[in-house]
Each structure stands twice: as C-alpha cells, then as structure tokens.
Amino acid sequence: MSDNLKLRPYKSTDAETIVSWIKDERALRKWSSDRYGDYPITAEDINHKYLDCNGDCEEPDNFYPMTLVDEGGPVGHLILRYTDEAKSIIRFGFVIVDDSKRGRGYGKKMLQMAIRYAFDMLKAEKITLGVFENNPSAYYCYKAAGFRELSTGKSFMIEILGEQWKCIELEVKREC
C-alpha cells in the first residue's frame, strides 16, 4: 500500500474511475443498494446524484463525497452525510475501493481517515453504515476499521436482483 494516501473532496472527474471499478450489476448493488436504476451506471449518473440530489439530504452542507488518492490517482471513494438535524450522526455510504487494490489495506485506511475527518472536522458523535451480509469482505473491512454491530442487532431485508439481501447496521462512536 502506498504511503502517500490522501482523502480529499470528490471531483466530478473521479466518477469515470469509480464507474470502472463496478464490474457487474451484483457489484453495483452491493455498492449502492437500490440507489441507482439500471446497470451499467455512468459517470454522469454519479455526478447527477451528487449534485442534484445532494445525497438525499434536505439541507446544504450535509453531504460530503470523498475520494482516496495515491500518487497514481483515485483508489477509493465514499460519501459522508449527516442523518440528524443536530448534526451529530454521520452515515457513510457508497464505499468502494479500486478492485485491483482490494485486500491490501486501502479500504481500512480510507475508512480510518474518514472516521477521523467525521469526528475531528465534522464534529460527529457517531458514524453509521450498512453492509450486506453477502459482502463479507466489506463487513470485515468495516470491523477492522473500528465499526461494530449495533447492540440491538439491527438489520433489515431488501429485495435486490430478485433475492432477499440482509443489510447489517454498523456504527462507531466517538471515544471520550
């Protein structure tokens, strides 16, 4: 893994690279659930969602798409968005790493950097995310970065590609 990793704000030019990491519809759905329509998606689809929909947030300054870069360019991506009016809870979403770099610590590092950003810069008290049970590599990456299953064991089912997928809720809280 590169020592020169930086988490920076998303640029519209990142979308082409992100789209190239999504190799099939199953990968798209694991990444985005039902948030996008038909497969394949385009760079314009991502940019439209980020600019026009503002990440399903109702107020400005609630949505933070970020890109992990090394000396060669983008290697990972995720979004951060507030889920409450008090701006104390951040939800991570659209978490993805360049498929050629998976299993090498990039995802864990990106999440750790994003956690630090959410706590230190955005002043969050808690960060949440959802992961599909059929995506064990992502689940274990999130756990390695510090996320834990909710004590309530909260999860829900969603129909994707004609199947019932279980989504497990994870969180990490600010340490006192």
Give residue ranges: language-model regions:
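Conserved acyl-CoA
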Residues: K109-K126
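C-terminal "cap" of GNAT-fold acetyltransferases
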Residues: I90, E125, F132-Y139, A144-R148, ...
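Conserved SAM-binding loop
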Residues: L7, V131
